[in-house]
UniProtKB/Swiss-Prot annotation:
Function in brief: DNA-dependent RNA polymerase catalyzes the transcription of DNA into RNA using the four ribonucleoside triphosphates as substrates.
CDD domains: RNA_pol_B_RPB2
Record GO biological process: DNA-templated transcription elongation
Gene giving rise to this polypeptide: rpoB
Complex and partners: In plastids the minimal PEP RNA polymerase catalytic core is composed of four subunits: alpha, beta, beta', and beta''. When a (nuclear-encoded) sigma factor is associated with the core the holoenzyme is formed, which can initiate transcription.
Compartment annotation: Plastid, Chloroplast
Name of this chain's protein: DNA-directed RNA polymerase subunit beta
Naturally occurring in which organism (per UniProt): Arabidopsis thaliana (Mouse-ear cress)
Keywords of this entry: Chloroplast, DNA-directed RNA polymerase, Nucleotidyltransferase, Plastid, Transcription, Transferase
GO CC, alphabetical: chloroplast; chloroplast nucleoid; DNA-directed RNA polymerase complex; mitochondrion
Length: 1072
């Protein structure tokens, strides 16, 4: 963060900065800390000693480029080398060598890592900070029970509780508790030392019975009592060294290691001055905690709010990577110990290089990036998605909460989130409130706390000076903080008025002179997604949440367009996403085409490769378009090429289109949207999608699989696009069912399946006739398109464990269709219900037909009025050829500021274009429009405008599905479930109720028998349908009913069913 003391201005920090700082901290500090902890390893006879020399570690630059790592499914990593020494104590000789410890995945310029060719990102986790927390709960009698919970660095808990007789207990498990005296004695104190170190010795003496005195008579007795209660062991255990080690390992290491953050928190909470390097829980801590608990019981001290951010810490990328390095080095230690003992047993002379293997470190990091819940595949739908993904904060993950167990209080917005965690941007569904997003200016402090910047206001010799402070959640409670959305521009007016301020989590109204701090920026409280919503202050928070989530689902369009109405953050989001190509220094363009830009600068000639039709992991198209011409001089930081969803270096997710808010023949009922065919034929909402299909070749027991064009028993038209090697040719147009890669898998045929001539060859010449099964890669349903890339990846040492992989990339051009999802930036989403001819669409007074018709009933009940402001201002901007960048909370300048701005711009547009219908004083913002089918004006004036509308990734091509025949489940004999398995219609309990409610007995019987799981009946249906006969009624029960009977029989319950004749009520028993 850049701060200027004189002017009080600040620059927005880089949006990827959190990730970069975390990784830098790991490389700069965490790596050395973990290597320094690696112990000296000796053999059993103490003759050989192995140690690492941390000061000389070295990370080597990667041998491959990022792009190659993605295409060849490799990891973009750096090799770690450390000097190691092997000392022979008898001769005092030392052999020192530089050894390779393993590969550490590196972070690229996007703040992500490439592991096995996949972009992965590590997100930050919020955990309960280690320390002590005091709380009170009501017991079943309605009496307050006070507890103090000590949380260790590993998340282990030790609870101290005080009962109604003022006796203090330490709870070691859910059911078992021991006296605080026994715990203190087991930690090494005697009774005299305990009483000397507490504030209330008389309370401790009050529950000291003869039985307790015996338990704490010696340290051994106390440890035995503690062990008995902790391990729930009966009888009389005997004190031993192994018992102490077990207690140390299972209890003290897990629940008493505080770490440096825990030590700092306990010192602050209990007013102790124990050195910071003492990271374990001491007897003095326990006694001070007990004293504090007694004070709580008698009304002294304050309880802790567990959901306050001062009681949370951020586990960043640095902490997670450091933990994994510690785990890998612990594994390496075991390997070295085993290798030394093996070398001595076989009388071999070891060297440092022979002792160390790179496997533990490399495999630990690969499994961390591949399996850890906080390591996620980077969502690359559009530039905004990439940026926002790295700024997520999660309560989930190891040591955290789960979606099932988290209560409402944890999910709720807390006053301490102000300026640190966005109150709007969170996920919808079960994880609501558990996955948040960092506010724009928030940063992670040295102690794992979230810090937010404020301007400090103070006067010195009557000259106001401003200084910027970064405050942690525990610090800003002591200041009066003026809210940034209530500051007028005119300081003279400011000093006279009372302003709303925040103090100790309460909102007050105070005089301006009493303000200590003020916010630095109107967007300070919001995440990036919420900050891109114009007029957000006029929207309901739920709709703003939906909007910030839906902007991340917007598909990059083939021809992007900047928004007319924005917030001003669009440029920074685009630049920090890394999507546009930017000049690193000034120079002159020498050559440019679609693949590269060559320019000279600083005496060098640089070639910048451009991304061409690259697939993102959401199948969207990443493509860069040059924006500079040959011979042009450029400056540092200038845009050389625009990427997907950027225009001129600004984020451009959607299109400004002409919209009317009116009902139209019921086609926009329940959020449906009506569109004009202009949007289809003009390629307004056309997007490109790239799908990847891959096939592997293995070495089977019968021999290797072959890639070939010669595939028997297949029609020639299916193989028409294959080249001589059996792989589809570049540029081919492929349809569903076409062969992309021809492959044959060898298999052994049975004797009876051989043709007579084959048997003759075997009998006379002994020739083994091989048969092969066709296992080609075929294009699935909905995959038609143009082949744009083919990659044949051959791993080194092509063994059966390293199969060859062939990847085929197919590009699809998708126009907007009925069933696609579109949305605005205010949570106003809808599905396209009908595409009208342009001549039938409602048209304006100047003859222009409207592009899209929204339902006006979607606005009042949802309270997202911001869309109306944006709509009208967009119309004015398109007529005046202006773009607007509006900060939120503009009402801080004057009342009704948004409405005044919109009306004044509409009035100006009306004057300049000489179109009085743009601003009509009787109904400003609305206009009389005409029905395209009849030419008659509609009864009511209608709001028209140009909002920014996005096309979302939820497209009908990915979702529509039908099946005539397909696979059935073996057990229930019902159609499989889901589009991916070519599944069919499954009729459940609620569907049956719905059909029963309408009384459609015959349809219901069909659904439950022929169309579902009646095996014989569904076989007969086809034949009777072909010959035009009547479908016979099924005589016995369907398979699911028979399955139910079998399950009941397994529970020893016999169920019979009978058929009752309609004529004579004769009962015929049928066997299931």
């Amino acid at each position: 963060m850049l701060g200027d003391e004189k002017e009080g201005t600040s620059a927005i920090p880089g949006f990827n900065q959190i990730q970069f700082e975390g990784f830098y901290r790991f490389i700069d500090q965490g790596l050395i800390e973990e290597l320094a902890k690696f112990p000296k390893i000796e053999d059993i006879d103490h003759e050989i000693e192995f140690q690492l020399f941390v000061e000389t570690y070295q990370l080597v630059e990667p041998l491959i480029k990022e792009r190659d790592a993605v295409y060849e499914s490799l990891t973009y990593s750096s090799e770690l080398y450390v000097s190691a020494g092997l000392i022979w104590k008898t001769s005092r000789n030392m052999q020192e060598q530089r050894i390779f410890i393993g590969n550490i995945p590196l972070m690229n310029s996007l703040g992500t890592s490439i592991v096995n060719g996949i972009y992965r990102i590590v997100i930050n986790q919020i955990l309960q900070s280690p320390g002590i927390y005091y709380q009170s709960e009501l017991d079943h009698n309605g009496i307050s029970v006070y507890t103090g919970t000590i949380i260790s660095d590993w998340g282990g808990r030790l609870e101290l509780e005080i009962d109604k007789k003022a006796r203090i207990w330490a709870r070691v498990s859910r059911k078992q508790k021991i006296s605080i005296l026994v715990l203190s004695s087991a930690m090494g104190l005697n009774l005299r030392e305990i009483l000397e170190n507490v504030c209330y010795p008389e309370i401790f003496l009050s529950f000291l019975t003869d039985k307790e005195k015996k338990k704490i008579g010696s340290k051994e007795n106390a440890i035995l009592e503690f062990y008995q209660q902790f391990s729930c062991v009966g009888g009389d255990p005997i004190f031993s060294e192994s018992l102490c080690k077990e207690l140390q390992k299972k209890f003290f290491h897990q629940r008493c290691e505080l770490g440096r953050i825990g030590r700092r928190n306990i010192n602050w909470r209990l007013n102790l001055n124990i050195p910071q390097n003492n990271i374990f829980l001491l007897p003095r801590d326990v006694l001070a905690a007990a004293d504090h608990l007694i004070g709580m019981k008698f009304g002294m001290g304050t309880l802790d709010d567990m959901n306050h951010l001062k009681n949370k810490r951020i586990r960043s990328v640095a902490d997670l990577l450091q933990d994994q390095l510690g785990l890998a080095l612990a594994r390496l230690e075991n390997v070295v110990k085993g290798t030394i003992s093996g070398a001595i047993r076989h009388k071999l002379i070891p060297t440092p290089q022979n002792l160390v293997t790179s496997t533990p470190l490399t495999t630990t990091y690969e499994s961390f990036f591949g399996l850890h819940p906080l390591s996620q595949v980077l969502d690359r739908t559009n530039p905004l998605t990439q940026i926002v993904h790295g700024r997520k904060l999660s309560y989930l993950g190891p040591g955290g909460l789960t979606g099932r167990t988290a209560n409402f209080r944890i999910r709720d917005i807390h006053p301490s989130h102000y300026g640190r965690i966005c109150p709007i941007d969170t996920s919808e569904g079960i994880n609501v409130g558990l996955i948040g997003s960092l506010s724009i200016h928030a940063r992670i402090g040295d102690w794992g706390s979230l810090e937010s910047p404020f301007y400090e206001l103070f006067e010195k010799s009557k000259k106001a000076r401003i200084r910027m402070l970064f405050l942690s959640p525990s610090q800003d409670e002591y200041y009066m903080i003026a809210a940034g959305n209530s500051l007028a521009l005119n300081r003279g007016i400011q000093e006279e008025q009372a302003v709303p301020a925040r103090y100790r989590q309460e909102f007050l109204t105070i005089a301006w002179e009493e303000v200590h701090l003020r916010s630095i920026f109107p967007f300070q409280y919001f995440s990036i997604g919420a900050s891109l919503i114009p007029f957000i202050e006029h929207n309901d928070a739920n709709r703003a949440l939906m909007s910030s989530n839906m902007q991340r689902q917007a598909v990059p369009l083939s021809r992007s367009e900047k928004c007319i109405v924005g917030t001003g953050l669009e440029r920074q989001v685009a630049l920090d996403s890394g999507v546009p190509a930017i000049a690193e220094h000034e120079g002159k363009i020498l050559y440019t085409d679609t693949e590269k830009i060559v320019f000279s600068g600083n005496g060098d000639t640089l070639s910048i490769p451009l991304i061409m039709y690259q697939r993102s992991n959401k199948n969207t198209c990443m493509h860069q378009k040059p924006q500079v011409r040959r011979g042009k001089c450029i400056k540092k930081g200038q845009i050389l090429a625009d990427g997907a969803a950027t225009v001129g270096g600004e984020l451009a997710l959607g299109k400004n289109i002409l919209v009317a808010y009116m009902p139209w023949e019921g086609y926009n009922f329940e959020d449906a949207v009506l569109i004009s065919e202009c949007l289809v034929y003009g390629d307004i909402y056309t997007s490109f999608h790239i799908r990847k299909y891959e096939i592997q070749t293995h070495v089977t027991t019968q021999g290797p699989e072959r890639i070939t064009k010669e595939i028997p028993h297949l029609e020639g038209r299916l193989l028409r696009n294959l080249d001589k090697n059996g792989i589809v040719m570049l540029g081919s147009w492929v349809e569903t069912g076409d062969i992309l890669v021809g492959k044959l898998t060898p298999q052994v045929a049975k004797e009876s399946s051989y043709a007579p001539e084959d048997r003759l060859l075997r009998a006379i010449l002994g020739i083994q006739v091989s048969t092969s099964k066709e296992t080609c890669l075929k294009l699935p349903i909905g995959g038609r398109g143009r082949v744009i890339d083919v990659r044949w990846v051959q791993k080194k040492g092509g063994s059966s464990y390293n199969p060859e992989i062939i990847r085929v990339y197919i590009s699809q051009k998708r126009e907007i269709k009925v069933g696609d999802k579109v949305a605005g930036r205010h949570g106003n989403k809808g599905i396209i219900s009908k595409i009208l001819p342009r001549q039938d669409m409602p048209y304006l007074q100047d003859g222009r037909p409207v592009d899209m018709v929204f339902n006006p009933l979607g606005v009042p009940s949802r309270m997202n009025v911001g869309q109306i402001f944006e709509c009208s201002l967009g119309l004015a901007g398109s007529l005046l050829d202006r773009h607007y960048r509006i900060a939120p909370f503009d009402e801080r300048y004057e009342q009704e500021a948004s409405r005044k701005l919109v009306f004044s711009e509409l009035y100006e547009a009306s004057k300049q274009t000489a179109n009085p219908w743009v601003f009509e004083p009787e109904y400003p913002g609305k206009s009389r429009i005409f029905d395209g089918r009849t030419g008659d004006p509609f009864e009511q004036p209608v709001i028209i405008g140009k909002p920014y509308i996005l096309k979302l990734i939820h497209q009908v091509d990915d979702k529509i599905h039908g099946r005539s025949s397909g696979h059935y489940a073996l057990v229930t004999q019902q159609p499989l479930r889901g589009r991916s398995k070519q599944g069919g219609q499954r009729v459940g309990e609620m569907e049956v109720w719905a059909l029963e409610g309408f009384g459609v007995a015959h349809i219901l019987q069909e659904m439950l028998t022929y169309k579902s799981d009646h095996i014989r009946a569904r076989q007969e249906v086809l034949g009777t349908t072909i010959i035009g006969g009547t479908i016979p009624k099924p005589e016995d029960a369907p398979e699911s009913f028979r399955l139910l009977v079998r399950e009941l029989r397994s529970l020893a319950l016999e169920l019979n069913h009978f058929l009752v004749s309609e004529k004579n009520f004769q009962i015929n028993r049928k066997e299931v």
